[in-house]
Amino acid sequence: VKLYDYVLDHLSLPFQQPGNKIRSAVLFHSEHYQVGKNALFEMIRLGLGKDNCTIITPENAVARERNFLENQLVLIDEILIDGDYKKRLSTLNILKPLMTQELHDSRPLFKNWRQVHSTCKMMLFTNFKNAISVKNNEARYTIIDVGKTRDEMGGDEFFNLFWNTDGTIVEEYPEIVKWFLSTRQISPNFNPKSISLKTKFLETMSKEGGHPLLPE
């Protein structure tokens, strides 16, 4: 499957097969800012419904409450795991079972531990090449470099089409995104239980992120 279709398959599955868990995650990297991440995340969130999609920080992702597990799609924003490779390794080892397993321990504030069944899918975004520590044969993260600036993508003339002056998304666009992702054919060879696609940028992030993760 081509990378373009692979990403669309990841986005389509929560709309078409909400109970089918994807056991890997897509991580977008861009060294540039204002390249449409917020517009994409918000349109997906509104398309799925606010109760089915949430945007969280890395700190929320590893906290014991894990309220986000009840969503169909979890978007983890501004990934940058501070500290040495050991801390990055520890954090990713917490995240990986959340991506690959369906039963998780959760402890909401002032409540006892409980077990939660979740088929949530995950996507991540970062502006930093050294955001995580991954080995060159990492099998659970498809790491994609968004190699264009805002101007190269069309600049304000393009991006302003999606936003109202009050900072909200133009109402029709989430519906268009929802229709497209709900009706497009998922690639016949896309296997949500399979390993991630290996990209050229995986090697870059492996070098920049310090000591690599051990493979599963």
Residue ranges and their predicted role:
Residues V1-I79, V177, L181:
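P-loop NTPase catalytic core of nucleic-acid-dependent motor ATPases
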Residues H32-Y33, P188-E216:
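DNA transaction DNA-binding modules
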Residues G49, L89-R114:
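Conserved catalytic/switch belt of AAA+ P-loop NTPases
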Residues A63-L69, R107-F125:
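AAA+/SF3 P-loop NTPase mechanochemical coupling elements
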Residues E70-Q72, S118-K121, N136-Y141:
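Short glycine-/polar-rich loops that comprise or flank the Walker A/P-loop
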Residues Q72-M99, A131-E138:
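Conserved AAA+/SF3 P-loop NTPase catalytic/coupling segment centered on the Walker-B
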Residues I132-E152:
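A short helix-turn-beta junction within AAA+ P-loop NTPase domains corresponding to the substrate/partner-engaging
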Residues R150-T168:
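Conserved phosphate-binding loops in nucleotide/dinucleotide-binding enzymes
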